[in-house]
From Swiss-Prot:
It comes from Listeria welshimeri serovar 6b (strain ATCC 35897 / DSM 20650 / CCUG 15529 / CIP 8149 / NCTC 11857 / SLCC 5334 / V8). Its EC number is 2.5.1.6. GO terms for cellular component: cytoplasm. The lineage of its organism: Bacteria, Bacillati, Bacillota, Bacilli, Bacillales. Keywords: ATP-binding, Cytoplasm, Magnesium, Metal-binding, Nucleotide-binding, One-carbon metabolism, Potassium, Transferase. One of its GO terms (molecular function) is ATP binding. L-methionine binds at E58, Q101, D253, K284. The gene is metK. Catalyzes the formation of S-adenosylmethionine (AdoMet) from methionine and ATP. The overall synthetic reaction is composed of two sequential steps, AdoMet formation and the subsequent tripolyphosphate hydrolysis which occurs prior to release of AdoMet from the enzyme. This is S-adenosylmethionine synthase.
Length: 399
């Protein structure tokens, strides 16, 4: 590797990974509830293990949804439909342990501090306080069209294409569990120049050889996802490096909601506030705040105000307005942090109800985000991925 160059690695997982099964179940339940009761409060956690699904959490709603059916339908859609996989949609046990949201939390979310103290006149927006304290990060970079870091973008692309090859039966020996990882080499200007390493671990039928798997992935997977200009004779490939991946899914590892937060975001390329997304309604700023921060960051880069930017938002429970906003452009902007913050404050309403309204979050859009990442999804129409405020933001800041 040339002097002053460096490597960066990100990973993704398939929809059949145990933690992602849990995320998808939690978000499928959220979607089912919010489609009937947009104002429902949902904090739904899922655990999966061999032959068992446990759904727990706090849900406050006036509607009924058939949680066991949602669980089984989600597992079936993912592809766990045979008992010999060690996890089967029809035969697994489904246990539920659901309570209502704590009234101590609810009073701060139902009526924000600003509303309770009479300090704000914008009653409709100020009425909702943040569902918890916490910090969230949003990020964007111009190194891909989707304004995402290249390592996580390619890792997701490999995981998504691998799942497609399985579900369309193009490679009918594949089973649902899989992981991908991509190492990108950056030059001294921090621009991606080549792929150093690709790792794919995919569950498979016991009778297929590793040589056959490797040949098929080089034929049907890598050319469909990776720009060949990034590949060279020194690019390393590790395909099922243990030599066998037959036991997978919840039979191989227990899965939990919220345990793939780096996969869900930027692959470690940007910082993370620690809060998970799946199973949470949009009053939870862990989710809506992170979506808003990505929306802000993406519009800053799309406006040409920076080449790379990280936005931090922070909230106090029961308080509507963010307690802080931070913007770091890594020296890629001609404008000061305060100029950017002033423009963002003028154009983006970052109070919880403002975010919910701005991004139209009280609708069933979450299940589709629970695998292959919440950001940079050109295959989905996600409101926080739009750049519809870029021109207005540019006009506010560029004098």
């Amino acid at each position: 590797m040339a002097k002053n160059r460096h490597l960066f690695t990100s990973e993704s997982v398939s929809d059949g990974h145990p933690d992602k099964i849990a995320d998808q179940i939690s978000d499928a339940i959220l979607d089912a509830i919010i489609s009937k009761d947009p104002d429902a409060r949902v904090a739904c956690e899922t655990t999966v293990t061999t032959g068992l699904v446990l759904v727990a959490g706090e849900i406050t709603t006036s509607v009924y949804v058939d949680i066991p059916k949602i669980v089984r339908d989600t597992i079936k859609e993912i592809g766990y439909t045979r008992a010999k996989y060690g996890f089967d949609a029809e035969t697994c046990a489904v246990l539920t342990a659901i309570d209502e949201q704590s009234p101590d939390i609810a009073q701060g979310v139902d009526e924000a501090l600003e509303s309770r103290s009479g300090s704000e006149i914008d009653a409709a927006i100020e009425a909702i306080g943040a569902g918890d304290q916490g910090l969230m990060f949003g990020f964007a970079t111009d190194e891909t069209e989707e304004l995402m870091p290249l390592p996580i973008f390619l890792a997701h692309g490999l995981a998504r294409k691998l799942t497609e090859l399985r579900k369309t039966k193009k490679l009918d020996y594949l089973r649902p569990d899989a992981k991908t990882q991509v190492t990108v080499e950056y030059d001294e200007l921090n621009q991606p120049v080549r792929i150093d390493t690709i790792v794919v671990s995919t569950q498979h039928h016991p009778d297929i050889t590793q040589e056959e798997i490797a040949k098929d992935l080089h034929t049907y997977l890598f050319p469909e996802v990776i720009d060949p200009s990034f590949l060279d004779e020194d690019t390393k490939y590790f395909i099922n490096p243990t030599g066998r991946f037959v036991i997978g899914g919840p039979l191989g590892d227990a899965g939990l909601t919220g345990r793939k937060i780096i996969v869900d975001t930027y692959g470690g390329y940007a910082r993370h506030g620690g809060g998970a997304f799946s199973g949470k309604d949009p009053t939870k700023v862990d989710r809506s705040g992170a979506y808003a921060a990505r929306y802000v960051a993406k519009n800053i880069v799309a406006a040409g105000l920076a080449k790379k930017v990280e936005v931090q938002l922070a909230y106090a429970i029961g308080v509507a307005r963010p307690v802080s906003i931070s913007i770091d452009t890594y020296g890629t902007s001609d404008y000061s942090e305060q100029e950017l913050i002033d423009g963002v404050n003028a154009l983006f309403d970052l109070r919880p109800a403002g975010i919910i309204h701005m991004l139209d979050l009280r609708r069933p859009i979450y299940r589709q985000t629970a695998a292959f990442g919440h950001f940079g999804r050109s295959d989905l129409d996600l409101p926080w991925e739009r750049t519809d405020k870029a021109e207005a933001l540019k006009k506010l800041i560029v004098k």
